[in-house]
Amino acid sequence: MSLTNEQIVDAIAEKSLMEVMELVKAIEEKFGVSAAAPVAVAAAAGPAAAVEEQTEFTVTLKSAGDKKVEVIKAVRAITGLGLKEAKDLAEAGGVLKEGASKEDAEKMKKDLEAAGATVEVK
């Protein structure tokens, strides 16, 4: 008697998780294969390596939030702009610094977020 694929799937569905794990292990041993997906692991490692290579970052102010005065002070400290220019930048948002090192970008983001701003680092 030959079983159909549907009958096999139904029989597996009735088994407990432990029984299915034992079945998978037995199939791996019998046919010399692995149920793991090595292609997915290799693909996931590629983008991570590309992220580590980035050395220059752009710090962008998205929103000043509720504490505009604190954000304006932080913008002035980071950019060296005058009060009016810093106020305009804080209210409108925009790029604060391009080509910043990772450490500088993280410090700017930390300082601006502490002041109440929403910041994006790319």
From Swiss-Prot:
Signal peptide: none
Presence of keyword Transmembrane helix: no
Pfam families (alphabetical): Ribosomal_L12 (PF00542), Ribosomal_L12_N (PF16320)
Taxonomy, superkingdom: Bacteria
Keyword Glycosyltransferase carried by entry: no
Any one of the GO BP annotations: translation
This protein's GO CC annotations: cytosolic large ribosomal subunit
GO molecular function: mRNA binding; structural constituent of ribosome
Keywords, alphabetical: Ribonucleoprotein, Ribosomal protein
Subunit annotation: Homodimer. Part of the ribosomal stalk of the 50S ribosomal subunit. Forms a multimeric L10(L12)X complex, where L10 forms an elongated spine to which 2 to 4 L12 dimers bind in a sequential fashion. Binds GTP-bound translation factors.
Function description: Forms part of the ribosomal stalk which helps the ribosome interact with GTP-bound translation factors. Is thus essential for accurate translation.
Entry similarity comment: Belongs to the bacterial ribosomal protein bL12 family.
PANTHER family the UniProt entry points to: 39S RIBOSOMAL PROTEIN L12, LARGE RIBOSOMAL SUBUNIT PROTEIN BL12M
Classification via HAMAP family: Ribosomal_bL12
Protein name, as recorded: Large ribosomal subunit protein bL12
